[in-house]
Swiss-Prot record:
PANTHER family the UniProt entry points to: TR-TYPE G DOMAIN-CONTAINING PROTEIN (PTHR43381:SF5), TRANSLATION INITIATION FACTOR IF-2-RELATED (PTHR43381)
Highest classification ranks of the organism: Bacteria, Bacillati, Bacillota, Bacilli, Bacillales
Name the record gives this protein: Translation initiation factor IF-2
Main subcellular localisation: cytoplasm
HAMAP family cross-referenced by the UniProt entry: IF_2_B (MF_00100_B)
Ranges that cross the membrane: none
């Protein structure tokens, strides 16, 4: 007979697993997690503790019910007495109203006389912001500006009313008046991250649904698993078995809601998947039992570990005859995911997304992990969260799918989403139903924003639409400035991209060195670089450290700075970072020349040469209406690829040169067909194919200079 586990015992008593774990730890019993089996003596000790408490609670509830009935009878008698007292008081108040009218008339005649205003007291403590002026500081101290200016003059500082004061000067003046000063830290309201707070310490925070991300390799069954959980078919509408966008769905299991994010499993969507891991509480790693660990599986593990998110492994396709779940477990141990049965802490759930076997076990494990994590949020706070996806709809305008992480989102709320803003016009849940409110961990699609945000952007709700508009516009302007800054200046890394658009191909260079001889030698060497069609323009040379004026010149001329045995000063460093100017520091002349030359070669228009990659012989032809002539071919040399250029050769003479229209193997489209295999080929705008023709495939390859 198998031993009872902690979570099973907790379920029996309607308690949380964490309560049982805490009690066991207080008994000095080592506990790893909620899946640990309980010994008989441990169960007896827990029974004494928890079953006694439940009996006492039942007794107290019956006593409280008796007390409530007695109190209700007493309250009825008291209410009758109170009504009589209220009637008597109302009669007395009528007489008082007449006296009040007479008093008001007398007060009108007694007008106050003009008296000189009493001098304001100097406060004991004053707060100030960075850059406060003499006039502003005088107002805070309740003194004349001239008095502050006089004190500054005695300290040897000549200042006027609009002069900014530094911290040291402010403290000197404050000491003279015996006032304590404190610098006020100004919070940048445009930084949306400041509105995201940890809700674990909030006394009003309540339990929220877990946000679960399903990750894994392409075609391992992520969307089919979601399909089984939601009982709806979404796989059929997807192209090539790859999820097109991150979708968010919410389901209910055992009275508790769970929110699922479906991230794309293809390697091209790595960034989007990483964003999904940042908002999730639990990761479901789907691994096919017949395929094992694949490249995207490893990427998903790394994303989850970086985000410090617990992983539950769903071993899918166990109903296939070639499935081998033990192999999957063995392979995952190399990445630190060790099953509980093998002494580890990772939960493995074998299942079949197609048949639905094991789905209930997976949902139960999600619930247990979420319970241990104690996920909380405060619905009373301002709504904040993350953009899951966004698009521009022809009929509705910009729309965004949001995940509410804290607070409650309402229709009509003023909102800032990334660099966009607006007022929520409509809100739709994952079932397509219009809703008015959305609490924590709820996915919704909204309309009413002025532009399309980026997936992964954060959103914050503000009480005032003007404030939301101001912050949104300010963030938008800041992003434009940043984009211009990033794309404006040339660097050796983006030299080819910057220069290839114009006909004139120049590289402006500023050289700074430790001695004049080095500067002249380096300038002469750079001028000797012989790359066709590219000019090196040395616009400034000098001896000494790189300074701020060098950076200003480089920024104005869209050039780069080369420092030979010299370093930039602090002002130049700050300016270079602000203006995004490329500075290259070297100690060997050869390294400078090599780096510049390799960057300049990218400026030239690339040269290509033709490379034959394969040949196919036409064995049979088929004429099909609306398609044209289909050639049944046999690949005799190399390979035929879908994107290759082709020549039709008949009796050694080239009949036609063009491109492939279709390449098929049996009835399926093929990317390439290798030597020794048959395929079907159609040529774009050419139907005069005959048996015995040779189709030669070629590619254009760039020549390295």
């Amino acid at each position: 007979m198998s031993k009872q586990r902690i979570y099973e015992y907790a379920k029996e008593l309607n308690l949380k697993s964490k309560e049982i774990i805490d009690e066991l730890k207080s008994m000095n019993i080592e506990v790893s997690n909620h899946m640990q089996a309980l010994e008989d003596d441990q169960i007896k000790a827990l029974d004494k503790k928890f079953k006694k408490e439940q009996k006492n609670d039942n007794k107290q509830s019956t006593q409280n019910n008796h007390q409530k009935s007695n109190n209700q009878n007493q309250n009825k008698g008291q209410q009758k007495d109170n009504k009589k007292n209220q009637q008597q008081n109302n009669k007395g108040n009528k007489g008082n109203k007449k006296n009040n009218r007479n008093n008001k008339k007398n007060n009108k005649n007694n007008k106050p006389q003009n008296q000189p205003a009493a001098p304001k007291e100097i406060p004991s403590k004053v707060t100030y912001q960075e850059g406060i002026t003499v006039g502003e500081f005088a107002d805070k101290l309740n003194v004349e500006s001239s008095e502050i200016i006089k004190k500054l003059f005695l300290l040897g500082i000549v200042a006027n009313i609009n002069q900014s004061l530094n911290q040291e000067t402010i403290e000197l003046i404050a000491d003279d008046y015996g006032v304590e000063v404190e610098e006020e830290v100004v919070i940048n309201e445009e930084d949306l991250s400041i509105y995201f707070e940890d809700e674990k310490d909030d006394p009003e925070a309540i339990e929220r649904p877990a946000v679960v991300t399903i990750m894994g390799h392409v075609d391992h069954g992520k969307t089919t698993l979601l399909d089984s959980i939601r009982h709806t078919k979404v796989t059929a509408g997807e192209a090539g078995g790859i999820t097109q966008h991150i979708g968010a769905y919410q389901i209910e299991n055992d009275g508790k809601k769970i929110t699922f994010l479906d991230t794309p499993g293809h390697a091209a969507f790595t960034t989007m998947r990483a964003r999904g891991a940042q908002v999730t509480d639990i990761t479901i790693l789907v691994v096919a039992a017949d395929d094992g660990v694949m490249p995207q599986t490893i990427e998903a593990i790394n994303h989850a570990k970086e985000a410090e998110v617990p992983i539950i492994v769903a071993v899918n396709k166990i109903d296939k005859p070639t499935s081998n779940p033990d192999r999957v477990m063995q392979e995952l141990t190399e990445y630190g995911l060790i099953p509980e049965d093998w002494g580890g802490e990772t939960i493995f759930v074998p299942l079949s997304a197609l048949s639905g076997d094991g789905i209930d076990d997976l949902l139960e494990m999600i619930g247990l992990v979420a319970e241990v994590q104690e996920l909380k949020a405060n619905p009373k706070n301002r709504a904040v969260g993350t953009v899951i996806e966004a698009e521009l709809d022809k009929s509705r305008g910009p729309s965004a799918s949001l995940l509410v992480q804290n607070g409650t989102l309402n229709v009509g709320d003023a909102i800032v989403v990334g660099n966009t803003y607006g007022r929520i016009r409509a809100m739709v849940n994952d079932l397509g139903q219009r809703i008015k409110t959305a609490g924590p961990s709820t996915p919704v699609e909204i309309t009413g924003i002025n532009d399309v945000p980026q997936a992964g952007d954060r959103f914050v709700v503000f009480s005032d639409e003007k404030q939301a508009r101001r912050i949104g516009e300010s963030r938008h302007e800041a992003s434009i400035v940043q984009q211009r800054q990033e794309s404006k200046n040339v660097s050796l890394d983006n030299l080819f991209e910057q220069m290839k658009q114009g006909e004139m191909k120049d590289l402006n260079v500023i050289i700074k060195g430790d001695v004049q001889g080095s500067v002249e030698a380096l300038a002469a060497s750079l001028m000797k670089i012989d790359v066709e069609g590219v000019n090196v323009r040395i616009i400034h040379t000098a001896v000494g450290a790189i300074n701020e004026s060098d950076v200003t010149l480089a920024n104005a001329s869209n050039g780069i700075i080369i420092g030979f045995n010299v370093r930039p000063d602090s002002g130049a460093k700050r300016a270079a970072e602000a203006e995004n100017v490329d500075m290259r520091l070297h100690r060997v002349i050869y390294n400078v020349i090599e780096e510049i030359e390799s960057a300049m070669k990218g400026l030239l228009d690339p040269e290509f040469e033709e490379q034959v990659i394969g040949q196919a012989e036409v064995r049979q032809t088929f004429k099909v209406s609306k398609v044209g002539t289909i050639a049944g071919c046999y690949v005799t040399e190399g390979k035929i690829t879908r994107n290759a250029g082709v020549r039709i050769i008949r009796d050694g003479i080239v009949q036609y040169e063009g491109e492939l229209d279709t390449l098929k193997r049996f009835k399926d489209d093929a990317k390439e067909v290798a030597k020794g295999y048959e395929c079907g080929i159609t040529i774009e705008n050419y139907n005069d194919l005959k048996e015995g023709d040779v189709i030669e495939a070629f590619e254009m390859v760039e020549i390295k200079r």
